[in-house]
């Protein structure tokens, strides 16, 4: 079973991700606040984390940095992180946050599934 953790305060972003991964053998877990990602990650140990760049007071960049710091401290497993950008120019900061893949919103279900396949070869 593949578990995808999506963090976005915008319902339409969470809906896009959920619709892309609504298939047998896949579970989508949602959080609406960036500060909740670390705890939820520890609970579900997802195969993929999808972060919206703009999430309230702790955005996707800060969350990605937090996950990488927790990983380097041995407190969390390595996370495959897909960052959803607002514009292509944001790729610079995404690279600084050590995310695995970036996509510019809006993205459709097919694009999200192809991105997941790049990060998770066994994902369907």
Spans of features found by a protein language model:
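Alpha4 helix (beta4-alpha4-beta5 surface) of REC/receiver domains from two-component response regulators
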Residues: 62, 83-102
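The C-terminal output helix
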Residues: 117-124
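His-Asp phosphorelay/catalytic-motif detector in bacterial-type signaling
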Residues: 72-80
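Conserved acidic segment of CheY-like receiver
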Residues: 1-12, 17-18, 49
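Two-component signal transduction core modules
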Residues: 49, 102-103
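Acidic, metal-coordinating helix/loop segments flanking the phosphotransfer/catalytic sites
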Residues: 32-48
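Conserved phosphotransfer microenvironments
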Residues: 47, 51-69
């Amino acid at each position: 079973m593949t578990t995808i953790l999506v963090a976005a305060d915008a319902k339409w972003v969470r809906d896009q991700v959920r619709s892309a991964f609504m298939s047998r053998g896949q579970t989508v877990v949602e959080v609406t606040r960036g500060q909740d990602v670390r705890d939820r990650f520890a609970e579900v140990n997802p195969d993929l984390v999808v972060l919206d760049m703009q999430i309230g007071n702790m955005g996707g960049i800060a969350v990605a940095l937090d996950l990488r710091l927790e990983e380097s401290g041995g407190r969390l497993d390595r996370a495959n992180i897909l960052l959803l950008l607002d514009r292509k120019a944001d790729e610079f900061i995404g690279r600084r946050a050590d995310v695995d893949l970036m996509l510019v919103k809006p993205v459709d279900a097919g694009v999200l599934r192809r991105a997941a396949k790049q990060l998770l070869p066994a994902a369907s």
